[in-house]
Each structure stands twice: as structure tokens, then as C-alpha cells.
Amino acid sequence: MWLLVGLALWWCLAPVRAWGVSTSASAAVLMDADTGQVLYDHNGSRRMLIASTTKIMTALVVLERASPGEEVTVRQEHMTEGSSMYLKPGERVTVEELLYGLLLCSGNDAAAALADYCGGTASFVRRMNGLARELGMEDTSFANPSGLDDDGHYSTARDMARLAVYAAGNHTFARLCSTRSVTVGGRTMTNHNRLLRTVPGCIGMKTGYTRAAGRTLVSAAERDGRRLVAVTLQDGNDWADHAALYDWGFAQETRQETAALNREDTP
């Protein structure tokens, strides 16, 4: 009897084996945002570079420390390498505009300006790591607010899925990252996340890329009141892989519910 109980508990807590679905990613996780159950896991605990998906954490720390309407003065030192929202030294922009530039354009200049405004970069990065610990992201370390490659900057697909679940529950963050296009302060910004236009129920999240990290993608989708989050790291086929994971994952939930109902109906 106890063996049967143990096996039943193991089945409930273990990741669902992804028969019929696969990805091109070096690491991938699909997680149920409502229950925390891992539905699919491929190298989910492997520490890897995460590129600009870092900016999910950056945005969350900003939302802790500043209000969207506050104004930030851009400085020369905020001009950094990589993707940009094309800020100019001396201009004044709101925190909300910078958050759009961070999440839609993946602006490293926006990340630098926000971190500097919210207590300075060193303090800001400490809070990024502090929040990571609070969320149980034990295999994660942040070294900067933008996601540029650094030996001390890494995470795992599982940890990023935990972060995505937390982020999806923040209404302001969810509104910002699911915006397809916006014009604020004379700038028109278009979301890099193609899934918003191609995957039913997608509520966005964050793309990323560096030569060393490859393509990284964190996303969330909601269908029929259920919400899933997907993470792929080092995946050249990430758009298609996320679409396939969601189609499989939402169908998997339906199959499990149907099986449960069938068991209840069995005399």
C-alpha cells in the first residue's frame, strides 16, 4: 500500500515526460504558472548565459523602487553597447518610457539609466540577486542589469521559469511586456517578441541574444483560464519551439483532466 502511495506522490510531483514534443534548445522548461508543476524539462538545471531575458528581473526591481511617472535624466554613461532605445544624453524621460524601451526594444541604455536612477548599479544588482534568492532561484547570479555576457552572470531554464511565473503576476509588468507597439515621448517602439502576434493567448515576456548565449526566450501564454510559462536557452528555433510547447502543454492539461474524470467515473 505504502509503495502505491509513494508512486502516486512521485507521479504528481515529477515533471511530466514530454512524449510527442521536443525543442532545439540546449535547455528548456515548460511550467504551469498556477501550480508550479514542471510539464517539460530538458537540461533545466544547467547554468547558462541568459542574455537580455535578464531584463525581466531588471524591470521587476525598477517597479519595486520607482513609480512609472518619475522622470530620469539621461547621462552619457548610460550609453552602452548592444541593443538600444536610442536615448540621448541630457533628455528627460519617464520611468515608464524607459521600461517600454527595456522590454520592447531590449535597450541596454534603458537598463543602465534605470539601474543608475534606482540607487546606482551596484545596489541595483544586489537587489536583483536578493530577489532571485527570495524566489528560490538558487542557480542564478546577476552581474549587470542588461544581460551582457559576464562570468558571474548566469541562470537556468528552471530558475527563469520561476522568475517568469512571478513576473506574470505583476500587473504592471504584464501590461508592459505584452504591449505590441507604443508611442511615448515621441518614440514609437515595437515589441521584438513575435509570439505576441503568432501564438494564441501569448502575453509576452522577453527575448534575448548575444553571440555567446545564442537566442534566449522567456514567454507566457494563457488559454481557458490556465497560464503556462516557457523558457528556451540557446535555441535557434525558439519561436516555433515555444509555439509547440504551448500547444502540447495546454493539450496535456486537458488530457490529464479528462483522465481524472474518467477515473472518477470508473465504478
Regions found by a protein language model. Name each.
Residues 2, 32, 56, 265-267:
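Catalytic-site microenvironment of enzymes
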Residues 2-12:
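Bacterial N-terminal signal peptides
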Residues 7-8, 16, 139, 236:
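Intrinsically disordered regions, especially transient/low-confidence alpha-helical propensity segments
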Residues 10-11, 33, 183, 197:
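Short, positively charged
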Residues 14-158, 165-169:
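Active-site-adjacent loops and short helices of periplasmic peptidoglycan-processing enzymes
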Residues 137-138, 149-267:
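Domain-terminus/edge residues, biased toward the C-terminal soluble/receptor-binding domains
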